[in-house]
Amino acid sequence: MVNKDNNYTAMQKNQYSSGTTNHPEHNDNPNYWDILLSDLKDSDKWSGKNALDFASGKGRNVSNMLSTCNWNRVDGVDISEGNIEFCKNWYNAKLSDWYCNNGVDVSDLKDNEYDFIMSTIALQHIPVYDIRKSLITDLLRTLKPGGLFSFQMGFGEGLESPLGPRSAYYTNFYNAHGTNSHHDVRVHNESDVIDDLKNIGFVNITTEVRPSFSDSGHTHWIYVKAYKSE
């Protein structure tokens, strides 16, 4: 278990307290639709089912998912109180519930609740492996058997960046002075992610590496899909 009062989470909650931008430019990333959300193109498959956006920001991804399929519900969870309050007011007529999490797990969410979980430009901002593992392990708990987790992280060589330092995948850098690209994690090889997800309990894991989009902190992104066993 990760202590929710750790230095990194305290810094992150402080920086995100008033909210973030909604990053509408990332809707123009073709890989967002063709890889990250490609499974939603078969809209009938998701009719009446539940989806979740982890690190949902101001609701862009939730809104996009709602527009693609006839879901029962598409929820959002985020560390920022400002973001969650915004979404509760802005999307109050949508089929969505909104949760503010503690930064180390998603304990307010039910077991076996979601058929599809996504996350983008989020996990790459957490250079603390133990926190990422805690979050991903808890997201697995919330997936229904056979459910899909689709996410993206920064990928490339070395640890240099014009925006600030990068940490390796298994590093625990609790004393980062900033988040949201100021001190990211960088995946160096696909096997690190695949092996980690297998150890957590996911199955049928696939990855695709593509050039990054509107992200000068990483030359490439890795898109990952992993399933909960039936």
Language-model features: where?
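A short beta-strand submotif of the Rossmann-like class I SAM-dependent methyltransferase core
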Residues: S119-A122
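Short glycine-dipeptide loop
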Residues: L143-F149
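A short, conserved alpha-helix within the catalytic core of class I
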Residues: I126-D138
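Class I (Rossmann-like) S-adenosyl-L-methionine-dependent methyltransferase catalytic domain
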Residues: M1-W46, K58-V106, Y129-D130, F149-E230
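Conserved beta-strand/loop positions that form the S-adenosyl-L-methionine
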Residues: F54
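Class I S-adenosylmethionine-dependent transferase superfamily signal
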Residues: M65, D138-L139
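A short acidic, Gly/Pro-enriched loop at the edge of an enzyme's catalytic core
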Residues: D108-I117
